[in-house]
A protein has these predicted regions:
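Charged/polar low-complexity intrinsically disordered segments
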Residues: 12-17, 136
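N-terminal beta-strand-loop-alpha-helix module at the start
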Residues: 15-74
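Short beta-strand segments
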Residues: 24-26, 48, 110-112, 141-142
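Short, well-ordered, mixed-charge alpha-helical segments that flank or form enzyme active sites
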Residues: 32, 117-120, 147-151
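Acidic/Gly/His-enriched mid-domain segments of enzyme catalytic cores or analogous surface patches
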Residues: 49-133
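Short, acidic/small-residue loops that bind anionic groups at enzyme active sites
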Residues: 130-146
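Long, charged alpha-helical interface segments
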Residues: 143-145, 150-161
Length: 161
């Protein structure tokens, strides 16, 4: 039996070996116990309210991106991309596209599961599929869940203890 691990990376060590790791902070608060997900990030993007969430856990993003409909608008700067309020995709999806454009091979989205906006959770799940189809090992992570999109094929998933 041939098992593929692409795009699933079984350990964080494997993920780091894969190439550039980008962490995206989305709109829901990030728990400090998720520190291991962003500690070794090569690049950090904060999508809209994700900026406040990153700051709460002591992370200074490399790029701020969003329409700022759910957070105070930051001062314009070289590391800020302002998106139009009227658009077809979420701020987190735009952040994922930016990560892909920057050459990320591993993307972790924190603050993208649950909350009052089911539409955003579903959009974030679709974002995982988009990233997987583009060859990126991508995960949505919170304190209780790790979600990864699997493309057709055979996969070996290691049980977490």
């Amino acid at each position: 039996m041939i098992c593929r691990s692409f795009p699933v990376c079984s350990t964080q060590m494997e993920r780091k070996k894969a190439g550039m790791k980008c962490v995206i902070f989305a709109g829901l608060p990030a728990a400090p116990e998720l520190h291991s997900w962003w500690a070794d990030a090569d690049y950090v993007i904060a999508a809209d309210a994700g900026y406040e969430n990153a700051c709460r856990v002591g992370v200074e993003p490399d790029l701020l991106l969003g329409d700022y409909d759910s957070a105070p608008r930051p001062e314009a700067g070289a590391k800020t991309v302002f998106l139009p309020a009227e658009k077809d995709d979420t701020d987190t999806y735009y952040a994922a596209r930016k990560a892909l454009e920057l050459g990320a091979t591993d993307v972790v989205i924190v603050g993208g599961l649950g909350g009052a906006r089911l539409d955003h959770t579903l959009a974030n799940l679709q974002t995982l599929v988009f990233l997987a189809k583009n060859g990126v090992c991508a995960t949505l992570a919170d304190t209780d869940n790790e979600v990864t999109a699997l493309l057709p094929g055979t996969h070996r998933i290691q049980r977490s203890e």
